Amino acid sequence: IHRVEEAGADLLHLDIMDGHFVPNISFGIPIIESIREITRLKFDTHLMISNPEKYLEPFKKAGADSLTVHLEVCPDPARIIDAIHVLKMECGLVVNPATPVEEIFPYLQLIQLVLVMSVEPGFGGQSFQPGSLEKIRRLRARIDALGLDLPIQVDGGINPDTAPSVRGAGADLLVAGSAVFRAPDPAAAIRTLRG
């Protein structure tokens, strides 16, 4: 964590997986509490979990700065967006590769971040799905047409080869795991990804 913080990372994107919504299990609230003590980086907390509404307040108390939830697990997205805002936190919505990006359009004016998954959620090291580029373009066009200052974040398969086309399609924030954490020089990797 200190290594990527010193390398100039803007935030830490924390993938929380429950073994239900996605097949993998990662870490949870106790780990967030522990790492909150050692860094001031923003915790961009990506909840790949079923029933996220049950865990909003515990994640806030643990030190999460923002909570991003999957559209696919929210029967009433406006309700969970409101619940996150009541906690005085930023809220993001995620759209998976198979979900039409237009399903997120009704909520764009209510959220602070849109996360486009460019791989299937749940496992690292997957290849970028090129079809995500058109989804990013359509999302960028809609956000711009509405006159919103709403960042588009892209997660999955981000590396020096995919980053330029993702940025070119309209993404603002790139989530890079292996490309940064496995790099011999994380600062150089971050600079390369930023373009």
Residue ranges of model-derived segments:
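Glycine-rich, proline-tolerant flexible connector loops at the mouths of alpha/beta enzymes
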Residues: 11-29, 71, 119-127
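A structural motif
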Residues: 6-11, 64, 111, 171
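Active-site beta-loop-alpha junctions enriched in small/polar residues
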Residues: 17-19, 48-52, 72, 96-98, ...
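C-terminal helical cap(s) of enzyme catalytic domains, especially alpha/beta-barrels
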Residues: 84, 167, 179-195
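Structural motif
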Residues: 7, 38, 62, 87, ...
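Catalytic cores of alpha/beta
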Residues: 53-61, 99-111, 156-174
